[in-house]
Amino acid sequence: MNKILEVENLVFKYEKESDVNQLNGVSFSITKGEWVSIIGQNGSGKSTTARLIDGLFEEFEGIVKIDGERLTAENVWNLRRKIGMVFQNPDNQFVGATVEDDVAFGMENQGIPREEMIKRVDEALLAVNMLDFKTREPARLSGGQKQRVAVAGIIALRPEIIILDESTSMLDPTGRSEIMRVIHEIKDKYHLTVLSITHDLDEAASSDRILVMRAGEIIKEAAPSELFATSEDMVEIGLDVPFSSNLMKDLRTNGFDLPEKYLSEDELVELLADKLG
């Protein structure tokens, strides 16, 4: 299978003189078209890993390969074109006076012809349902709308990989759901690979695969159905349990005949509707 991202034995510390490593031998790979989430407690190394992949830190031990090519100081700018990163706070990403200016900014830096930029701006804003807002000032948008524009700015650049670095953590539940729906849609439309750094276990549950980090190391790798199947495993890792897992446990205690495997909220609602219908 085509591995679009390979990470081998990453070791990193923020200060050279420090005895503490933020990452200790992190290794994993992602196949083209996969959605992989990294979860873990604060300080576990999730965001540090994502930023190393995006070439934001120069000095580290180990290997990062993007689409088969090893990341180096010499090729970082070329390889970074294959990656789009959406950060936690959309306000920190805005540079344009209007929504369309902001989406066009990255393309201007890449020297994309004006006619092509105009076409891509409209296509990207349409994909995130923000085309009607293209002449608005970003400051007048809601949090969810701002994050949609940030996503539009990324997909206009035509990356192969999107990295979501806690990109929904500042949104309310409705805004969070809308952004995740939009990203799933554009992933399928543009055949993208997604690496999601998240605290939201319900968000991670929609991934193909989950990596669990603790103290700079990957301590577990599994499909959501396996990882979330037992609440005891999640507690041992030091993480919360998804709402649907807790609800299923309570329902079983009260006599409901439910499968032992993990079900997402939507899957559980569908199952209960069938049983009670």
Curated annotation (Swiss-Prot):
Keywords: ATP-binding, Cell membrane, Membrane, Nucleotide-binding, Translocase, Transport
Disulfide bonds: none
GO CC field: ATP-binding cassette (ABC) transporter complex; plasma membrane
Membrane spanning stretches: none
Keyword Transport attributed: yes
Residues that, per the record, bind ATP: 40-47
Catalytic residues identified in the record: 166
Main location: membrane
EC number of this enzyme: 7.-.-.-
Gene Ontology terms for molecular function: ATP binding; ATP hydrolysis activity; ATPase-coupled transmembrane transporter activity
Gene3D superfamilies documented for this protein: P-loop containing nucleotide triphosphate hydrolases
Its membrane topology: Peripheral membrane protein
ABC transporter domain span: 5-240
Top EC class, one word: translocase
Sequence similarity: Belongs to the ABC transporter superfamily. Energy-coupling factor EcfA family.
PANTHER family: ENERGY-COUPLING FACTOR TRANSPORTER ATP-BINDING PROTEIN ECFA1, HEAVY METAL TRANSPORTER
Self-association and partners: Forms a stable energy-coupling factor (ECF) transporter complex composed of 2 membrane-embedded substrate-binding proteins (S component), 2 ATP-binding proteins (A component) and 2 transmembrane proteins (T component). In L.lactis forms a stable complex with EcfA' and EcfT and substrate-binding components. In E.coli forms a stable complex with EcfA', EcfT and individually with 3 tested substrate-binding components (BioY, NiaX and ThiT) with a stoichiometry of 1.1:1:1.
Functional summary from the UniProt entry: ATP-binding (A) component of a common energy-coupling factor (ECF) ABC-transporter complex. Unlike classic ABC transporters this ECF transporter provides the energy necessary to transport a number of different substrates. In this organism these probably include biotin, thiamine precursor, niacin, pantothenic acid, queuosine precursor, riboflavin and thiamine. Uptake of niacin or riboflavin into proteosomes containing EcfA1A2T and Niax or RibU has been demonstrated. Uptake requires hydrolyzable Mg-ATP and is substrate-specific; NiaX-containing proteosomes did not transport riboflavin.
Official protein name in the record: Energy-coupling factor transporter ATP-binding protein EcfA1
Lineage: Bacteria, Bacillati, Bacillota, Bacilli, Lactobacillales
Gene expressing this chain: ecfA1
